[in-house]
Amino acid sequence: ARNFEPDTIVLMNVLEHLAEPIASLKVLSSIAGPSCKLLIVVPAIQALYNRMDSEAGHYLRYNRKLLIKHHIEAGWNVVDARYFNFPGIFGWVLAGYLSESNKSESALNAKSTNWMIRVYDKLFIGLSSFTDCFTPRMAGLSLCCVSTKSSSNHS
């Protein structure tokens, strides 16, 4: 039987749902092929944590330093970690504020939240692409990290 050794692993908005993210990253390292690349996207900036995060089952929102630390502790070599979607911060804060003012419905399914997402998608995606060129190390609604398997973890 052939062992499964992926050459690429992608986690999109998964790590923030895990109670033991470092242990999970170690498991991924143990199954990864020797030249495996790991791409992870997580919500960023703990100060933005609000009712929508809680309802979505998020344990936390990451900052760059913590995400890199978790990767290193799990045996991954971080190639790059950068924030993106800077304008989205303002929409997230507004949606969080509105969800606090109307606790009778789910923050994730609120009409105001869905309306704001549609407006953002139509008006601000282009702005986000522009601002991401200038803010990758400073701030953004999300954080992306690319890592490779540590040479000390090769089988």
Task: Show the residue positions of the predicted features.
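Conserved SAM-binding loop
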Residues: 1-50, 64-68, 145-150
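A C-terminal cap/extension of S-adenosyl-L-methionine-dependent methyltransferases
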Residues: 2, 88-155
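Conserved short-loop catalytic and cofactor-binding motifs
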Residues: 12, 54-55, 78
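Short, solvent-exposed loop/helix junctions and linker helices
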Residues: 18, 61, 137-138
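Short, glycine/charged-enriched secondary-structure capping and boundary segments
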Residues: 23-28, 53-56, 94-96
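Short catalytic/ligand-binding loop motif for oxyanion handling, primarily in non-cytosolic enzymes
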Residues: 47-50, 87-91
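Acceptor-substrate binding/catalytic loop of class I
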Residues: 51-70, 83-84
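Conserved S-adenosyl-L-methionine
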Residues: 76-87
